[in-house]
Structure formats: C-alpha cells, structure tokens
Amino acid sequence: MKCPSIFLTLLIFVSSCTSILINESSDEQRIYSFSPTTSPFDPRSLNQELKIGRIGYCFDCARACMRRGKYIRTCSFERKLCRCSISDIK
C-alpha cells in the first residue's frame, strides 16, 4: 500500500513541475519587430546574431519578405509567426 501511494505522490509532483516549466517558457516569447523607416533591413547586420538559433528563423522570414519585395514587419520564433509589410521596398 505504501509503494503505490508514494508512486502517485511523485507522479503528481513531477506533472505539476512540468506544467510550471511549460508556462514559464511560454512567457518568454520574443517578438522581433523591424521598422523600415528607422533602419532598413540589412541581412549582413544579422550575421553576428545568426549564431543564436532563434534569429535564424527571423533571418529566413526576412529573406522571404525581401523575395516578395516587402519589408519584414514582425517575426516570432516561438509562434512561428512571420509577417511582411504591406508597402513595397522602394
């Protein structure tokens, strides 16, 4: 009788800890916003940042926007969100 109760207690403890960790990691979502009026997007300026894995997704997002002739508006790695601007590159 002792063994099943200890096992269930540990199971509840582990499941509550994992839910707390999942909630904390989702709070740390970062959205990178780019404004073409203040500084136009330059892919060479991100070369230093590409060593961080999360920026790589936004770099690909920016290249996709540039292929369409648009500026990048927002990029979020966690949500896999990539939005291009409405206005064309001049």
Curated annotation (Swiss-Prot):
InterPro entries: DEFL_AtLURE1-like. It is found in: Secreted. The keyword Signal applies. The keyword Cell inner membrane does not apply. One of its GO terms (biological process) is pollen tube guidance. Residues 67-87 are annotated as: PRK6 binding. Its main location: secreted. GO terms for cellular component: extracellular region. Residues 1-19 form the signal peptide. Glycans are attached at N23. Disulfide bonds join C58-C75, C61-C82, C65-C84. Expressed in the pistil. Detected exclusively in the synergid cells. Pollen tube attractants guiding pollen tubes to the ovular micropyle. Binds to PRK6 LRRs. Belongs to the DEFL family. This is Protein LURE 1.4. It comes from Arabidopsis thaliana (Mouse-ear cress).
